[in-house]
From Swiss-Prot:
The encoding gene: dml-1
SUPFAM superfamilies, alphabetized: Tubulin nucleotide-binding domain-like (SSF52490)
Protein name: Protein dml-1
Entry-linked Gene3D superfamilies: Tubulin/FtsZ, GTPase domain
Coiled-coil residues: none
Organism the protein comes from: Neurospora crassa (strain ATCC 24698 / 74-OR23-1A / CBS 708.71 / DSM 1257 / FGSC 987)
Upper lineage: Eukaryota, Fungi, Dikarya, Ascomycota, Pezizomycotina
InterPro entries xrefs: DML1/Misato, DML1/Misato_tubulin, Misato_II_tubulin-like, Tubulin/FtsZ_GTPase_sf
Length: 540
């Protein structure tokens, strides 16, 4: 079945994953004559609930600190009786003293879901934890609370790379985390295609993730692993983080990148950029908002790994190979463009008109099909939103620049969803297939496109961050067309060199030389001797 197992590490990643799972849940169809576009067996596991009914739950393991799960209990309506009387899973088997803290009350949204009522609209004030907008039941085995650290503690902050490393090492020595938490999900899979890891890169979760990936790679040497590494540049900008704390986060990232790079098939550092198109309006201080935008891009670009359509389906290993076409280039950049769902009036016009130009204009309003974009931009497609972190100690707005600011693209995959298939698209797809069989120069960009008519859903759990042409928020319950991309390009070279220079002075002599050499070696993999613009002209 080519199953994918997910690892969720920390509060920020759990916000992201909650948006991801809510979207997956919305793709279920309940009519026998309606086949879903997505193969749900890839991300969901069958089971038997407490009352003997069949269940379907995510193949995921969720780690968070004490207090990070909010009002979500380890058990739920499907498994509560089965687990009653059992000790909740937590990484501690020593003597216990019962201390009851006041329970975190459920949000009104969760109360309405449990009662089968229409939930009230969510706001940044009512979303306190990722569990406040969660629409999915998880198996009790999926929920792992780490009691050694408390969420948002000022006394023992979970903010340093070494802290995460040490926590994993101590817990793994005592409990064997992989064997206890991850292996049961892997062993129940028929033919696992890979593991996706959602983690922070610039805090202690980076150290935790690096050690976890090392263990996984030792046990499952050939398994494809995608790492989605979030950075909190936008939250730091909104909160005015001190220069010292920003330097700490960059040092954490440098350490995480050099370690994760050794084990992951693809590493995607991402953050919400300082500059966004006018069609996106969000609260930069809200994790709910920030991760919603990132989730729309990530959920879209990974669709080929779970689509039923064989013409637009590939495994994680195949996707990784296509991105890493020229050596050890496994650090990728994430991009996205979107357009609102066509109105009913526009759909009528689209279906009824024979005017090619009018149809083309309406289709362009709905963004562009990936195959057409690849045909028109054989050296790489640059989308409206670039999630690549700047890695700057002092915040610099990324220029939206012209062609001179665009780095050389080595390889790129694009996924489009929701666009009309017309003659232009068919011709572009055929041209792409012909190009794939042509003998290539190592200096040519490797391009691959995927498409599905399945639009990205705007659920009632998703914030209204997208705007229409008049600036009004898009209504919940609708859907949008999305084009999302993963690219390996020459900009990584300069960013890693800059990161090396910035953090070098903040790291002790013992580690400075080794870390500097590893960053330089990584950077050299992305230096091909030229880019479409001068290095001096880049901001990042």
């Amino acid at each position: 079945m080519h199953e994918i197992i997910t690892l969720q590490l920390g509060q920020q990643s759990n916000y992201l994953a909650t948006h991801f799972w809510n979207a997956q849940e919305s793709y279920f169809t309940y009519s026998e004559d309606q086949e879903p576009a997505v193969n749900h067996d890839i991300h969901w596991r069958p089971g038997i609930g407490a009352d003997g009914t069949e269940t379907y739950m995510p193949r995921t393991v969720i780690y968070d600190l004490k207090g990070g799960f909010g009002s979500m209990a380890k058990t739920n309506a499907l498994y509560n009786d089965l687990e009653e009387g059992q000790t909740p899973q937590a990484l501690w088997n020593g003597p216990t003293v019962l201390q009851k803290q006041p329970a975190i009350p459920q949000s009104a949204y969760q109360q309405s879901l449990d009662a089968g009522l229409e939930p009230p609209p969510l706001t940044t004030d009512t979303v306190r934890y990722w569990s406040d907008f969660n629409r999915v039941f998880y198996h009790p085995r999926s929920v792992v609370q780490l009691n050694e650290y408390e969420l948002n503690s000022s006394i023992m902050p979970f903010e340093r790379y070494a802290t995460g490393e040490d926590l994993f090492a101590s817990l793994d020595k005592e409990h064997d985390l992989l064997d206890r938490d991850l292996r049961p999900f892997i062993e129940e899979a028929d033919q696992m295609q890979g593991i996706q890891v959602m983690t922070g890169l610039d805090d202690a979760w980076g150290g935790f993730a690096a050690k976890y990936l090392e263990r996984i790679r030792d046990e499952y040497g050939k398994t494809a692993m995608f790492v989605w590494g979030s950075e909190q540049e936008s939250v730091m900008r909104a909160g005015g983080l001190s220069r010292e704390k920003r330097l700490l986060r960059l040092a954490n990232k440098a350490r995480t990148m050099t370690e994760v790079y050794k084990y992951a098939s693809v590493v995607v550092p991402f953050t919400v950029p300082a500059t966004l198109p006018g069609s996106v309006v969000l609260d930069a201080g809200s994790q709910w908002h920030n991760t919603a935008l990132s989730a729309a891009a990530i959920e879209s670009v990974t669709l080929p790994s779970r689509l039923r359509d064989p013409a637009n389906r590939d495994t994680m290993a195949t996707l990784a190979d296509s991105l890493n076409a020229m050596g050890k280039q496994n650090v990728a950049s994430l991009g996205m463009s979107f357009a609102p769902e066509p109105t009913e009036e526009e759909d009528v016009v689209m279906e009824g008109t024979q005017d090619f130009r009018q149809r083309q204009l309406l289709n362009q309003k709905s963004s562009r099909h990936a195959a057409v974009m690849v045909k028109e931009n054989p050296e790489g497609v640059f989308l409206d939103i670039n999630f690549t972190p700047t890695d700057q100690l002092d915040y610099v707005r990324r220029r939206g620049g012209g062609d001179d600011d665009r780095p050389r693209v080595f390889s790129q995959m694009l996924t489009s969803r929701g666009y009309e298939i017309d003659e232009q698209v068919q011709e572009a797809k055929e041209a792409e297939e012909d190009e794939r069989f042509r003998r290539r120069s190592s200096y040519e960009t490797v391009m691959k496109s995927y498409h599905t008519p399945l639009r990205f859903p705007l659920l009632d759990s998703f914030p209204q961050i997208f705007r229409d042409d008049s600036g009004e928020p898009l209504k919940r319950g609708g859907a949008i067309n999305v084009t999302s991309s993963l690219s390996t390009d020459a900009s990584v070279h300069k960013r890693l060199k800059s990161l090396r220079t910035t953090v070098g002075r903040s790291i002790g002599l013992e580690d400075r030389e080794q870390l500097g050499n590893e960053l330089a070696e990584m950077a050299d993999e992305y230096h091909e001797g030229w880019s479409s613009g001068s290095d001096d002209g880049d901001d990042d």
